[in-house]
Design a protein with these regions (language model features):
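Extracytoplasmic gating/loop element in the C-terminal half of outer-membrane beta-barrel translocons
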Residues: 584-633
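C-terminal motif of bacterial Sec signal peptides marking the signal peptidase cleavage site
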Residues: 27-29
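Interaction-mediating elements
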Residues: 31-328, 360
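Flexible glycine-/small-residue-rich
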Residues: 50-52, 152-156, 167-169, 236-240, ...
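Transmembrane beta-strand segments of outer-membrane beta-barrel domains in Gram-negative
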Residues: 208, 360, 410-591, 631-632
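Short beta-strand elements
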Residues: 131-139, 212-221, 333-340, 461-468, ...
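Outer-membrane beta-barrel initiation region
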Residues: 247-424, 496-503, 511-521, 539
Length: 633
């Protein structure tokens, strides 16, 4: 009893503290300058305005501001500052310590940082070709708070009058002068970012062609703005220190290197001696394998997922692809690739692999609440990430739940699922779900599938082809009361509690225009799905003499009608960036499902619906749309 009282008091104190904190935040929101020293000001708001120019969005310039206001929620509420202001001057108090720890101290206005911000903004505008840009500031001071605005007048930008290339190496000159791929042209607006991207393009192309030691930092630009009004001459050339090297030193830089051998080090420890009994090594066709303990992956599997091949030229793209391919293998946690020069024009490639957890077991227990019914659920999962020593990933999950219903009944559900993923992006899944409601029905659901996933990350597009999608719903028992109330011929729910087969295939994909290099630009997300079912079975029904249901006239497989339908879904989301920390999101869904042939309605699990705790809460789950109906139950 004493223990219970103690815990209860602790919980009560925590609840009281949270309530007081909430009230304090609301009250302190009106006194944001509580901890602002006398004679100083709180930086309340910072804005950036660019006059009559859409080439340089204000959102892209915010990152150059050296001092920003306190963090805001919903664009106006400084919640963390409000929490901080609930603290008292006595820092020893527990509530004061936590308020200062959770909250955010006020940002004190600094004129020095304003000057630094103006310098950075001026430099950013210069990099975009606006060398005559003017940066001004305006301040509004009220109640010891400062609202600060940066006003940028770009004026006319400079353009490139003449772009020239002066490089000693013929291969390098050929790459830089390639008009098909170059990013810099005469007449374009001067842009330091594009010039830097051109350096990266030239250097990357050289490294793809075998020039291992070539780097973008070896290239430089010289600009002359005295040639014309608001015009610049730009010349690409080698860095001064490169031009001063001897011919032999230049030859090392402009030499094509080949891969001699590829070394795989699996769980390699350089402190172990070669004669260590737990360390093993083997070699084949230019590949060398070194591992400690039990071999992690088959050698053929590693070779298949390594685009870097002995005898090939060094290629930067192949290095990136090797990183991507090896990191996708389930048992591998860490990948590191390095190169060692072993002769005048040869490199050895060293790939270090570190294994992750091969086996994982998880368990969970939770309380559930659905449509007014309380329950309890427990689940267990097992994952093997290297089932056949070929990076195959097996996942097995089981879950059981017990629910107390408002009408005094109960519901039991048990389900198990298994999925086997192969490195080739093929996955096989199986599942079984058992539902028992003693006052209503008993239902079993079997499903199986075979799918292939194909990703194109460079354009933000993923594809998923589901070659086999099988579902079998079987209800061995339905109570008479439930049948009379819900399953009359005029009630739409009747079709939700019928045995049926679904044998289909489908394709789905998703696309995003988000680019990590431009995180503050607005972007689209698109998801689409196409699926059909029953066409193959309907084509085989007549020649194979399938049974025909006498009541509906539909074909049956194993005394069960199979569904035939087509379905298409599209989901579009547009993220309008208002500020680096704020965005407005528009979302639209469109879907159509058409039964035909062997079906008069869409199967229950493939229908569209709304309602429920996680949807439109005014309606119970699956009782809202699309369309409407009036059941007789």
């Amino acid at each position: 009893m004493q223990c219970y009282t103690s815990n209860s008091n602790k919980v009560s104190k925590i609840v009281q503290w949270l309530f007081c904190l909430f009230c304090g935040v609301i009250l302190c929101a009106c006194n944001m300058t509580k901890f602002v020293p006398r004679g100083q000001y709180l930086l309340n708001d910072v804005k950036v305005h660019v006059e009559d120019n859409k080439d340089v969005p204000a959102a892209d310039l915010v990152k150059y501001i050296q001092q920003k206001e306190n963090t805001e929620i919903l664009g106006f509420w400084k919640l963390q500052l409000g929490i901080y202001n609930t603290a008292s001057l006595d820092t020893a108090k527990w509530t004061s310590k936590n308020a200062r720890k959770i909250g955010e101290a006020p940002v004190i206005f600094s004129p020095e940082l304003v000057d630094a911000s103006c310098t950075q903004l001026k430099r950013a505008m210069n990099n975009k070709g606006y060398f005559r840009a003017i940066v001004d500031t305006t301040m509004q001071v009220k109640d010891r708070k400062v609202n600060l605005a940066y006003h940028i007048t770009p004026n006319e930008p400079y353009s490139i009058r003449n772009y020239s290339i002066s490089l000693d190496n013929s291969e390098l000159s050929s790459v830089a002068q390639n008009q098909r791929y170059t990013l810099v042209h005469n007449g374009m607006q001067f842009d330091a970012d594009i010039l830097n991207q051109e350096r990266l393009r030239v250097a990357s192309t050289m490294r793809r062609r075998g020039y291992f030691y070539f780097d973008q930092e070896m290239l430089q630009y010289k600009a002359d703005s005295t040639r014309g009004k608001q015009q610049i001459d730009v010349k690409m050339e080698l860095q001064d220190y490169i031009q001063m090297l001897s011919d032999e030193e230049k030859e090392n830089i402009f030499r094509v290197y080949k891969i001699a051998r590829v070394h795989f080090h699996i769980d390699y420890d350089p402190t172990r001696l070669p004669e260590d009994k737990e360390m093993y090594a083997s070699s084949r066709d230019g590949y060398v394998f070194t591992w400690v303990g039990k071999q992690l992956l088959r050698e053929k599997m590693l070779i298949r997922n390594c685009p870097i091949k002995p005898g090939d030229r060094y290629n930067e793209n192949l290095v990136e692809r090797t990183y991507a391919r090896l990191n996708q293998l389930a048992p591998i946690k860490y990948v590191d690739i390095s190169f060692e020069q072993i002769s005048v024009d040869e490199l050895d490639c060293h790939i270090v692999l570190s294994r992750g957890k091969l086996n994982t077991i998880s368990a969970e227990i939770e309380g559930t609440y659905s449509a007014g019914d309380w329950g309890i659920a427990a689940g267990v999962g097992y994952v093997n990430r290297n089932l056949f020593r070929g990076a195959e990933e097996l996942s097995v999950d089981g879950r059981g739940s017990y629910e107390w219903r408002q009408n005094g009944g109960r519901a039991i559900e048990a389900k198990v699922s298994a999925e086997l993923k192969f490195p080739s992006a093929i996955a096989i899944d199986l599942g079984y779900n058992f539902q028992n409601r003693p006052d209503e029905y008993t239902r079993s659901i079997f499903n199986a599938g075979l799918e292939y996933t194909f990703k194109q990350p460079h354009i933000g597009l993923n594809h998923q082809f589901r070659f086999v999608d099988i579902s079998y719903v079987y209800l061995p028992w339905i109570s008479d009361a439930f049948r009379d109330q819900f399953l009359q011929s005029t009630n739409i729910l009747k079709y939700s509690y019928e045995n049926h087969f679904i044998v289909g295939l489908g394709y789905s994909g998703n696309y995003t225009s988000f680019r990590a290099r431009q995180p503050h630009r607005s972007y689209w997300n698109l998801y689409y799905n196409l699926e059909t079912a029953g066409n193959l079975l309907r084509g085989l029904a007549k020649p194979l003499h399938f049974n025909i249901d006498q009541e509906s006239g539909n074909y049956e497989l194993f005394n069960t009608q199979f569904a035939q339908f087509a379905k298409a879904d599209v989901s579009v989301t547009y993220n309008q960036m208002l500020h680096p920390k704020h965005r407005l999101v528009f979302h639209a869904d469109l879907g159509v499902a058409i039964p035909y042939g062997n079906s008069q309605t869409i199967p229950f699990e493939k229908r569209y619906f709304a309602g429920g705790a996680n949807s439109v809460r005014g309606w119970s789950a699956r009782t809202l749309g699309p369309g409407g109906y009036r059941g007789n139950g």
